[in-house]
UniProtKB/Swiss-Prot annotation:
An individual GO BP term: arginine catabolic process to ornithine
Gene: arcA
Organism this protein belongs to: Mycobacterium tuberculosis (strain ATCC 25618 / H37Rv)
InterPro entries reported in the protein's UniProt record: Arg_deiminase
Protein name (record): Arginine deiminase
EC nos: 3.5.3.6
Signal peptide: none
Record family assignment: Belongs to the arginine deiminase family.
Length: 402
């Protein structure tokens, strides 16, 4: 009998975590497509893999079972023919490719073994990589495309497993991701949870393909209390729909909708604040005095949405504590901005008072240590080119309950 899956906090001892080791999908990045694929540079892939291996080894050394998304995907494709059909259907963009090419591509993908199919579903495929016997005389799309263009687009953001599935209590949320470059990620996590034997019997919470919610915006502040950032990725409609779904399933009694700036540096709530202990949060200094929250609560008569209030006060009230301790990165403004950009506030808690952080954020880490938080550092010079830190790169599937 394995560990019971589920999580009701950000800081309970981490028992099972889903990661994605970066691979061939990062080698698809070029100066022409980095903006489209949401990267700020071209990572040195082998170094990024070394950094990720260090991260995975650290989590394992602290007692977490590390599940790799590519392994889960391959195993699900091997286990289920329905999984294969689901993955192929999501990857073949018939409106863009046209019916003749879509049919030929689908037939080719059906011929692949599970490992090779998993590779194509994550790394993508160019027109040059189509089988040599693909008919060119029936597809204008094939005739007119440049050989290096993608017939299946790669998923370089898969490394950020936080966004495409969220465990809340014993259930998993498969959200709708906001940007085109990431939409298919959710289809792969959906496939894994639906068809991998490890997740047999796991029930879903909140499934939407219309109102975007991303996992980086969802923080489990305490049992029954969920904060949802509303900004560049998660919409107000998505936050409200998630809240109502959690109430209906008795997974939360309070949801805090937290407006954040609609800019890349603050794309998710966890880029400006994360929990580091049961009553303690690290927060970007520039938002400490301005971050607000709308409290959404379930009542006997339905759902009420309160007026905006200071976030720390609203959070403490919902959590049932006197005060939320905030460790802010209130150093030199230039250093604070640099370290926020480098995911200094994007920590991953392994247990109450124990977090993983990028080593490069020296001053933020020092402030955490001065406040009594144990900080375990990892390298991230290459992993950080996609604008994500340790929390972004991890999907906790099981934590000890608080």
């Amino acid at each position: 009998m394995g560990v019971e899956l589920g999580s009701n906090s950000e800081v309970g001892a981490l028992r099972v975590v889903i990661l994605h080791r970066p691979g061939a999908e990062l080698r698809r990045l070029t100066p022409r497509n980095t903006d489209q694929l949401l990267f700020d540079g071209l990572p040195w892939v082998s170094r990024a893999q070394d950094e990720h291996d260090e991260f995975a080894e650290l989590l394992a050394s602290r007692g977490a079972e590390v599940l790799l998304l590519s392994d889960l995907l391959t195993e699900a494709l091997h286990h289920s023919g329905a999984a294969r059909m689901q993955g192929i259907a999501a990857a073949v963009d018939a409106p863009r490719l046209g019916l003749p090419l879509a049919q030929e591509l689908s037939a080719y993908l059906r011929s692949l073994d599970p490992g090779r199919l998993a590779h194509v579903l994550t790394a993508g495929m160019t027109f040059n990589e189509l089988p040599s016997d693909t008919r060119t005389d029936v597809s204008l799309v094939l005739r007119m495309h440049h050989g290096g263009d993608f017939v299946i687009e790669p998923l370089p953001n898969l490394v950020f497993t936080r966004d495409s599935s969220i465990w809340i209590g014993p259930r998993v949320v498969i959200p709708s991701l906001a940007l085109r470059a990431r939409v298919r990620e959710a289809s792969l996590t959906d496939l894994i949870y639906a068809h991998h034997p490890r997740f047999t019997g796991v029930r879903r919470a909140y499934e939407s393909r219309t109102a975007p919610v991303e996992g980086g915006d969802v923080l489990l502040l305490a049992p029954g209390v969920v904060a949802v950032g509303v900004g560049e990725r998660t919409t107000p409609a998505g936050a409200e729909a998630l809240a109502r779904s959690l109430f209906d399933d008795d997974l939360a009694h309070t949801v805090l909708a937290v407006p954040i700036a609609q800019q890349r540096a603050q794309m998710h709530l966890d880029t400006v604040c994360t929990m580091v202990d049961t009553d303690t949060m690290v927060m970007y200094a520039n938002v400490v005095d301005t971050l607000e929250a709308f409290t959404i609560q379930r009542t006997p008569d339905g759902v009420t949405i309160g007026d905006a209030a200071p976030f720390a006060e609203a959070a403490a009230k919902a959590m049932g504590i006197d005060k939320l301790r905030v460790i802010h990165t209130g150093m030199d403004p230039v250093v604070a901005e640099r370290e926020q950009w480098d995911d200094g506030n994007n920590t991953l808690a392994l247990a109450p008072g124990v977090v993983v952080a990028y080593e490069r954020n020296v001053q933020t880490n020092a402030r955490l240590q001065d406040a009594g938080i144990e900080v375990l550092t990892i390298a991230g010079s290459e992993l950080g080119t996609g604008r994500g830190g340790p929390r972004c790169m991890s999907c906790p599937a099981a934590r000890d309950p608080l």
